[in-house]
């Protein structure tokens, strides 16, 4: 069911009547070499069911062994989120039956997580900060992946067959769970988006995950309930599952606020259920009834001992924490002498890390900003993808800047080179060669084009010689057209001035 089939309350009216309460659960795949409880490769993109073993397939007699690097990185995430680290935590079995869960249970953590009681301060679009409190960050294994065939939505409903890929089963996950986010009002969607963005930046800075929402290495479950203004008790929540972009997080929260408000206003009740986010129109659709913790029949996994994290080890890990994103931003703002507004623009465009890497690759901050915040951001918006998923790397931008500086590309040709990179035609040099983009250096060819343009525009020549030197734009344009944009505008202007002197 699409948004057009739902009655939605106007957003401003929602806020007059109801107070939203959010809870966000973010699953972060760790970038370890092997899985959480076995030696199979955890690398993304392998042939289906090639990275499997008896443990991840749940074969009888297979025993799990904890990935020590996964535990270390879980502690690292917990510390960066200002959490307390448990000296002893336990793995538990979360029991449920689903085709992508070969063992019919998931190894997770329940009442003894490795990290708890933390917070993450996030910066909103107007520069204000909001503290999101963290309930817990716990270790678990990922499930397999289902591909549904024959339906129209790509989901199990209406499908004629489902394919199971167990490569992902057993990959290390950290699930970061917030405490209820109250009092957000109209800013609830924005806070949700800012929190996920900040968490993504954090895990990337720590080097524990690539944070790719589009590839599923970060997945967001957004819980939302409404309560009448002034009421203390929480309403019934829904959980929108597996949201895979920052924009979608914002849209899903907004839609659920409007949908739930209309249901309540019409005298209906909110079902405690999971919901699916629909990329096409930003709506959510009904999933399944939402289980409670009791339904999962958690119990300590008898095959795994407690995870012991001595204080000395935790402090050793703390000492390895890199410069965290908010510290880095403050340093960059001071070094680059950016105003608060300029810094917010970079953060809101999710471009800061890309710009920093571009500067490290050899450009100036202004050159890097000009490309990422304008042309490349425009291309990302047109494609409906996040900036870092467009296919343009900092090295590509640094290369086109260098070619422009060397006079081998004009800005227009440089944009065409970036277009080729986005289209998957190779790196910048390969695109320039394949498309024949390099600036024309044949003085004879350019001089011929200038002569022809002057001959075709005698009125402009007359005005120029009468003292109006600003009229040569049409001549330059004609030359650029004749050379298919490959002439150097500075060289063209010099030739025009020389011939009209």
Curated annotation (Swiss-Prot):
Residues 276-299 are annotated as: Disordered. It comes from the Bacteria. HAMAP family: GatB (MF_00121). Its EC number is 6.3.5.-. PANTHER family: GLUTAMYL-TRNA GLN AMIDOTRANSFERASE SUBUNIT B MITOCHONDRIAL AND PROKARYOTIC PET112-RELATED, GLUTAMYL-TRNA(GLN) AMIDOTRANSFERASE SUBUNIT B, MITOCHONDRIAL. The gene is gatB. It catalyses: L-glutamyl-tRNA(Gln) + L-glutamine + ATP + H2O = L-glutaminyl-tRNA(Gln) + L-glutamate + ADP + phosphate + H(+); L-aspartyl-tRNA(Asn) + L-glutamine + ATP + H2O = L-asparaginyl-tRNA(Asn) + L-glutamate + ADP + phosphate + 2 H(+). Pfam families: GatB_N, GatB_Yqey. Residues 288-299 have a biased composition (Basic and acidic residues). This is Aspartyl/glutamyl-tRNA(Asn/Gln) amidotransferase subunit B. Heterotrimer of A, B and C subunits. Belongs to the GatB/GatE family. GatB subfamily. It comes from Corynebacterium glutamicum (strain R). It is an enzyme of class 6 (ligase).
